[in-house]
Design a protein with these regions (language model features):
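Compositionally biased terminal segments of proteins
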Residues: 8, 14-191
Length: 191
């Protein structure tokens, strides 16, 4: 093995150890790649939502993330749970846990916020609501991994109607500026 390859491996391993021990329970770029790859290997199609979904649409990581939000089709839900529990994730019951929205955490503090949906004649059924089919038409990248995600317009709509935080403000303003979308009224005070 050449010297530069050995140096790269040593650097990568040191960086990986550093991020594992000093990340305050964040889901890093490397974590996202690992999660996406393990689900892809199980032939599970996922759609990114939330902060990582925004960053995928933008094409780069724009902030830190405490979780990864994934939408999976109902037919793939059991295999998805089997894959992630096989990697050490356990369900964490939250106030908002439903049959279609669960949270999973591993011993390293990585959190997967799992959303289960199904395709219906009128669109996409999630948590008792029907959304337009194009909701999942977003395309983006996490590094060199092409991903499907919630489209920019739906991402902005999903950030309405609740008490938002600074990450929500960051995400909405970034989406609106990047994709030339109108900034929602409740976010205009942050311009």
């Amino acid at each position: 093995m050449c010297q530069s390859a050995i140096q790269w491996i040593v650097f990568y391993e040191m960086f990986r150890i550093f991020t594992q021990t000093n990340r305050n329970f964040m889901v890093t770029y490397f974590d996202v790649c690992e999660i996406l790859e393990m689900l892809s290997e199980a032939s599970v199609k996922v759609f990114l939502d939330g902060g990582w979904g925004v960053d995928a649409l933008i094409g780069r990581e724009t902030r830190t993330h405490n979780d990864i939000d994934l939408f999976v089709e109902k037919k793939d839900y059991c295999i998805t749970i089997s894959v992630i529990t096989g990697k050490g994730y356990r369900e964490v019951i939250m106030d908002y846990t439903t049959d279609s929205h669960t949270v999973w955490k591993d011993d390293n503090g990585r959190i997967i916020d799992m959303h289960c949906f199904e395709y219906v004649e009128d669109g996409i059924l999630y948590d008792g609501y029907i959304f337009p089919s194009e909701t999942f038409s977003g395309k983006g990248n996490i590094g060199n991994i092409e991903v499907s995600c919630i489209n920019p317009e739906a991402q902005v709509q999903f950030h309405l109607g609740y008490e938002y935080d600074e990450d929500d403000v960051h995400d909405v303003l970034l989406l609106c500026r990047t994709f030339n979308l109108e900034i929602p009224e409740q976010y205009k005070t942050h311009i």
